[in-house]
Amino acid sequence: VTRHIPWIVTAIIGVVALTVVAISRGESVNALWIVVAAVSCFLVAYRYYALFIARHVMRIDPARPTPAVRRADGLDYVATDRTVLFGHHFAAIAGAGPLVGPVLAAQMGYLPGTLWIIFGVVLAGAVQDFMVLFISMRRDGKSLGELIRMEMGQVAGTIALFGAFMIMVIILAVLALIVVKALAESPWGMFTVAATVPLAMAMGAYTRWIRPGRIGEVSVLGLIGLIAAIMYGQAVAQSPTWGPIFTFTPIQLCWILIGYGAVASVLPVWLLLAPRDYLSTFLKIGAIAALAIGIVIMAPPLQMPALTRFVAGDGPVWAGGLFPFLFITIACGAVSGFHALISSGTTPKLIASEGDAPMIGYGAMLMEAFVAIMALVGASILDPGVYFTMNSPTALIGTDAASAS
C-alpha cells in the first residue's frame, strides 16, 4: 500500500487541477493548472492503466522472443535499445499535427481541447497505438493491411492496403509541403537539417560497431553535434560561398526529399532512420520541456476564455461546430488513426523485448499528447486579438489585434 501513496497523491493533484480548469467561469485561470492536470493524469495513466492493459489484456511476456530477435537480419529486423526506439517512434508520430491542431482548436476556448486531449489520449489514443503495436509484434511485424487481410480475408485486406496507401500519399504530401515551405531559400535551416543525416549515420555506426549499447555516450555526442549544427548554420547562411550551396528552391527541395526517402528506405534502419529520429527527438522534447519550465516559472494566465462564441461553428480561423470538428481538428495528440500505420510499420520490427512495448506504444503517445497540451496552452495565453490576427484571414478580421478582438 505504501508504494501507491505517491501515485494517490499525484492522482488527487490531477483531479484538483482538472476541476479548477473545468469549473472556472469568467475568472482568470493560470496556465499552470492545465500543465499540472495533464502531467498528473498522464503519469497515473501510464503507471496503472497501461500496466493493466499490458498484464491483463495483452498478457505481455518479456521472455517471449520478439520479431527483432527471431528474424534478425541487420536490415529491417534489428533489436534496438528502448530509449532509441522510443525516440524513433515518437518522432514518427509527432509531426506537425500535435502543434497545428490544438492551436487551431483554441478558437473555441481552452476547455474543449484540454478535456479532449487528456481523456482522448488516456482512454483511446494511447490504447490504440499500444494495441496495434502489440498485435503487429505478435504477428512478426506485419503491417496494418496485412493484419486485416489475415483476420478478415483478401478483399478486406486489399481495401485496407489501398486506403492506407492513399492516406500515406495525402499525409506525406501535406508534411512535404510544410518542410518545403520551412526550408525553401533558407540556407541556415537547410544546413542544420542536412547535417543531421551524417550525424545520425555516425551515431548508428557508433552504437553498432564502436561502442555497442552505449546509448548515453552516443546521446551526448549526438546532442553536441546537433547544437553545433544549429549554431554553425548561421555562419553558413552568411557565407558568400556556402550560403548559395545550401539555398534551394521549392522544386529542388521536392526532388531532394524524394531522393532522401528513396535512399533511407533501402538503408538498414539502425544506420539512418532510427538514430535520426532519436536525434530529432532531442529538439522536439527539449523545446516542449523548455516551454513547460517557462510556464511553471512564469505561471502566465490564460487569455482565451474557457469557451468562446465560436463553438457554434462560425469561427474565423476555421468553420465547424464543436462536434464533430473539434475531434477532427485535434487528432494527433488525442486519437489518430494514422498512428496505427506507424505502430505497425518499422517499430514492431525493432522492439528487443515485449516488456518495452508499454513505454513505446503507450508512453510515446502520452508524450505527443503533452506536446499538444503545450501547443494549446501556448495559443491560449495569447491575447485573443493577437491570436485571431495571427491565425485568421485578414479579409475576415482585419489587419491588427484591435480589429480582431
Model regions and ranges:
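Membrane-interface "cap" regions at the ends of multi-pass membrane proteins
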Residues: 1-13, 44-99, 281, 320-321, ...
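Hydrophobic, membrane-embedded alpha-helices of multi-pass small-molecule transporters
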Residues: 14, 80-97, 249-267, 293-300, ...
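Hydrophobic alpha-helical segments and their helix-loop junctions in multi-pass secondary transporters
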Residues: 185, 204, 208, 224-255, ...
